Swiss-Prot record:
Single Gene Ontology MF annotation: NADH:ubiquinone reductase (non-electrogenic) activity
Name of the protein this chain belongs to: NADH-quinone oxidoreductase subunit A
InterPro entries assigned to the protein according to its UniProt record, in alphabetical order: NAD(P)H_OxRDtase_bac/plastid (IPR023043), NADH_UbQ/plastoQ_OxRdtase_su3 (IPR000440), NDAH_ubi_oxred_su3_sf (IPR038430)
Top-level class of the enzyme under EC nomenclature: translocase
Assigned EC number: 7.1.1.-
This protein's UniProt keywords: Cell inner membrane, Cell membrane, Membrane, NAD, Quinone, Translocase, Transmembrane, Transmembrane helix, Transport, Ubiquinone
């Protein structure tokens, strides 16, 4: 078992790397705001729409179906995120890993069928 000093010695390079990464990314985000010249112009503050004046307010309401499609995309994107590492390590995880992923896919398929039957995907 590792002692506290050995544990600190093992994780010190990771902590230093994380600290440098936070410092550099913060510096990269703050430096342009500090060094740039700010020239405000009325034309720069207006919305731009293909060279024309905007036809309507940019804050118009979207149909809820767009949000449903976006949520479906996120759900199935997460499914692929879990499915690829599972497929790669299928030989080592055994039957428990196989059946747990089958249960996960079953729940997703049931949810998809429910949305389909309720008409969430009909336009």
């Amino acid at each position: 078992m590792l002692q506290n000093s050995e544990l600190l010695h093992e994780y010190l390079p990771i902590a230093i790397f994380f600290g440098i990464a936070v410092l550099v990314s913060g510096l990269i985000m703050m430096l342009p705001n500090l060094l740039s010249t700010k020239k405000y112009n009325k034309d720069k503050l207006e919305p731009y729409e293909c060279g024309f004046a905007p036809f309507s307010d940019a804050r118009s309401k979207f149909d809820i179906r767009f949000y449903l499609v976006a949520i479906l995309f996120i759900i199935f994107d997460l499914e692929i995120t879990f499915l690829v590492p599972w497929a790669i390590s299928l030989n080592t995880i055994g039957k428990i890993g196989f059946f747990s992923m089958m249960f996960f896919l079953f729940v997703l398929i049931i949810g998809f069928i429910y949305e389909w039957t309720k008409g969430a995907l009909d336009w």
